[in-house]
Regions:
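Glycine-rich phosphate/pyrophosphate-binding beta-alpha loops
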Residues: 110-112, 121, 192-196
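Active-site region of the double-stranded beta-helix
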Residues: 85, 109-116, 128-137, 145
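Non-heme Fe(II)/2-oxoglutarate
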Residues: 32-47, 156, 182-184, 189-233
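Double-stranded beta-helix
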Residues: 133-192, 210, 214-216, 227, ...
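Non-heme Fe(II)-dependent double-stranded beta-helix
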Residues: 1-8, 14-107, 113-116, 153, ...
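Short, conserved beta-strand element in jelly-roll/cupin
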Residues: 115-133, 176, 208-213
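Conserved hydrophobic/aromatic beta-strand scaffold that supports enzyme active sites
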Residues: 10-12, 123-127, 172-174, 182-184, ...
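Active-site glycine-rich loop that binds ribose-phosphate moieties when present
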Residues: 105-109, 126, 165
Length: 233
């Protein structure tokens, strides 16, 4: 594992995507946005807020170029420095904050949403638009994964339909970055995002990777995906 990743809980990869990959992700996202805003939330998840906060998830297999991308050698070059291991795709989704009304997202660890004990995994957050504090960038709380590897207590916020795992005063580090930047952070790293107060949507793509398939320990059922990532030469 990278010493910086271990010490901070995240790594930033500037200019990580080619123009072709960035264009492909934007095209797929925009095509999915043409679907009704009630994008399966009632049956698949309960954290979407319609046009204000959309989660367009688990659709990579519908788009061959995206299907290739999420397990590609290009992804391995991002994931391996963080996990120091082969990896499998665990989950993926586009997250879009609507123009002028895009909802914020409370402090949480991604692991808190899994629902059972599991090894930490990696979230690869990709900016599809230039990301600012005005349009809802991600904020991170640095975390030493060696000394503080656990899952914090979270509380469900019914009004905003989300978990909250931090009630302190630290605003976190804003990940202000141009489109094509990748922020890779541990599923144990606390993060949040602000509201989008601009006149344009803020789009991001999130793919998550684990060193092993994530299974429910009681049933043995696979949680989402376990697609091997191709090792980079």
């Amino acid at each position: 594992m990278s010493e910086s990743f271990d010490r901070l809980g995240y790594l930033l990869f500037a200019n990580a995507l080619s123009d072709d990959d960035l264009g492909m992700l934007r095209e797929v996202c925009d095509k999915l946005l043409e679907e009704p805003a009630q994008d399966g939330g009632a049956g698949l998840h309960n954290i979407g807020l319609g046009d204000a906060r959309r989660f367009l998830r688990h659709r990579h297999a519908d788009f061959p170029a995206l299907d290739e991308f999420v397990t590609s050698e290009r992804i391995d070059r991002i994931v391996r420095p963080c996990l120091d291991s082969d990896s499998v795709l665990f989950n993926e989704q586009f997250v879009v904050k609507g123009a002028g009304k895009g909802a914020s997202f409370a402090w949480h660890q991604d692991s808190a949403y899994v629902g059972f004990d599991h090894k930490p995994y990696l979230t690869v957050w990709i900016a599809l638009d230039d990301t600012t504090e005005e349009n809802g960038c991600v904020y991170l709380l640095p975390r030493n994964l060696e000394t503080d590897p656990g899952i914090d207590a979270h509380e469900w916020q019914e009004d905003s339909r989300e978990l909250n795992g931090y009630f302190g005063d630290d605003p976190g580090r804003p990940m202000v970055c141009p489109a094509g930047t990748v922020v890779a952070f541990s599923s144990r790293t606390l993060h949040r995002s602000g509201p989008n107060g601009t006149d344009r949507p803020r789009r991001a793509y999130i793919a998550q990777y684990s060193v092993e398939p994530i299974r429910n320990p009681e049933t043995g059922d696979l949680k989402r995906f376990a697609k091997p990532v191709r090792r980079a030469a």
